[in-house]
Amino acid sequence: MSYRELIAELAREHAEEFSDALLELGALSVSVEDADADTPDEQPLFGEPGLTPDRTAWQRSRVIALLAPEHEPAVLLTAAANEIGLEAAPSFTVREVEEQDWVRLTQSQFDPIKIGERIWVVPSWHDAPDPEALVLELDPGLAFGTGSHPTTRLCMEWLEQSVQPGQSVLDYGCGSGILAILAKKCGADPVYGIDIDPQAVESARHNSERNRAEVTYGLPDACPTGEFDIVVANILSNPLKLMASMLSSKVKPGGRIALSGILARQADEVAQVYARWIDISVWREHEGWVCLSGTRRESH
């Protein structure tokens, strides 16, 4: 069985309600993308906890709807346009989508990832390219963190260079557990991972068991008291600023902290908040994202 993919471009103010109308009229799925993606006019668009996004769609939005064989694209498009009061239906193209083995197709899109000097992140359906390397077995899943995002990569490279055997580590905002697992494999002990999402905590526990890495996970109310040799938090800039006092207090005097999920243009603002307790600066930048690193001062 083959499906059809309807692709239309709309102005920002119509994209969301047009997508909703397509779903109501029977589209199997709808996604919205930046019509200027991979061009100089591409626009980043995301929100952070505690902040309201200033936009909910791109200036030129591409709406992509997957249609069952019985749906006529032009008829569906016209009906959706009428539903939201457009004077005319937008121009569109149609692409045939053949039935596929979606599991196999998805797996083919995820290869082992080399990070730093000796780290490999390997999906379960692949063999490690270098058996002597520091291997983390992780499958793409519901929790953030498989090593492909620049911020995860930056934190992993920092941990590889920073963790010494026997040091205590706190991964705040642990997601999939990838950073906590890496810290453990680098010799840290004990290692704790904290996340606000119960599903992420369960995912992290599963990943730690698969990697035979002993890490204690929990929600924020289970965060251990006391201080750590190393604290790492790969979240976003606004939550990092809001939690600056708490995260800084978790670092031992003389201990180190790494922060990411920060765009390069946000680095100074985040660093200024932490400067009250931490001697902090940009450690490394990658693809427009940065990792801040610092040491807690002995006098605080």
From Swiss-Prot:
Pfam families: PrmA
Secretion signal span: none
A GO cellular-component term linked to this record: cytosol
Gene3D superfamilies recorded: Vaccinia Virus protein VP39 (3.40.50.150)
InterPro entries: Ribosomal_L11_MeTrfase_PrmA, Ribosomal_PrmA_MeTrfase, SAM-dependent_MTases_sf
EC number from the UniProt entry: 2.1.1.-
Protein family according to the UniProt entry: Belongs to the methyltransferase superfamily. PrmA family.
The protein's role, per its UniProt record: Methylates ribosomal protein L11.
Protein name, as recorded: Ribosomal protein L11 methyltransferase
